[in-house]
Amino acid sequence: MKEIGRTRSGLQMGYTTGSCAAAAAKAAAEMLLSGEEIRQVRLLTPKGIELYLELEEIMRKKSEVSCAVRKYSGDDPDVTNGILVYATVQKVEKKSKINSENSVDLSEKINLDGGIGIGRVTKPGLEQKIGQAAINKVPRRMICEAVEEVCRKYEYTGNLQVRLSVPEGAEVAKKTFNPRLGIEGGISILGTTGIVEPMSEKALTDTIYLEMKMLKENGTDWCYVVPGNYGMDFLRKKLHVDTAFSVKCSNYVGETIEDAKLLGMKGILLIGHIGKFIKLAAGVMNTHSRQADCRMEVLGVHAAMNGAGAAVVWEIMDCINTTEAMEILRREKLIEPVMESVMKRIEFFLKNRAGEELEIGVILFSTEDGILGKSENADELLKKIQENR
């Protein structure tokens, strides 16, 4: 396989399970509609990187074709590395004949479902509805676009069903967080860019330092700090600001604050999703789930502080993610007071870590509610960063 590329730290990139699924679906559709066997498929990822992926386990019938793409994680220590992701594409006369009430219509003509080794959602709060296959929205879009491309090529206007499967999925899923998330029976099909960009912890923290150092050396004294793509998208699409003055910190909030102090930055504004940044209210400065997962404890305590009864607190403690917990707070009309007290604790811990030499602020958001809370100096910091005076 041709090397995909390397990160700035020299580590080999890989590709996601979403890319595997989209590539396998595209190849199966190509063979089904052309009647000819192919051994390699081209896929353009959302990141803009072209992949040329080898096909395995090809099985062709008159009305359906299946094939597999092997997952490659590069230098990322990913438990899904090396597994085969299968796609079966089948012609169907009418979508009403599809035998699964939990399948998903990607378009008027294309239906998607998961088979063996693809996890099923059993609890609310995830991207998919209960009962549906754990195939996230970006991979769904990738699969739809890939199959539609083939349909246009062969001027096919009939209905197709795509079924994904991962024979090793149930076993591999035991090594992931899926059981804790309420996803049973297999792995999730994931990915936001289609590409796996691995980083060792040291390489990642070194990169954070270098990114901030470059800003500083180019005359920037104030910057945004976001964990990753969600924060970056929020900057662009919701706050409508220039992301040139931003640094991705991943899970390393504490290290990033120390870097800012060491480099002599005047101030930083942290902007993050509640799923990560709620942990800051407990003083947790490395937000990776391996380090600590106090999300429900924080929300439960602050709900109790604002009048929630024991039953509500226990309900929050049983949630699998912050989206589900926020629905409970919304029902109890507690979002505003809880976010107010949460923000006070976040500010306390951030200011304690930053000290007097670094001005620090924070904006907390969710996909559903937008801005949930912000520090008193957040608007002022936004202005300073955009002006960089």
Residue ranges and their predicted role:
Residues 1-175, 179-181:
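Generic N-terminal targeting/processing segments that precede catalytic cores or assembly contacts
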Residues 109, 140, 343-389:
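Extended hydrophobic packing segments that form well-structured cores
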Residues 60-63, 86-88, 130-133, 180-185, ...:
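Short, low-complexity, polar/charged sequence segments that are solvent-exposed and flexible
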Residues 2-5, 12-18, 181-187, 192-342, ...:
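A structural signal for small-residue-enriched, beta-sheet-centric alpha/beta enzyme cores
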Residues 152-153, 233, 237, 327, ...:
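Polar/charged alpha-helical tracts
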Residues 171, 232, 371:
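Flexible, glycine-rich phosphate/dinucleotide-binding loops
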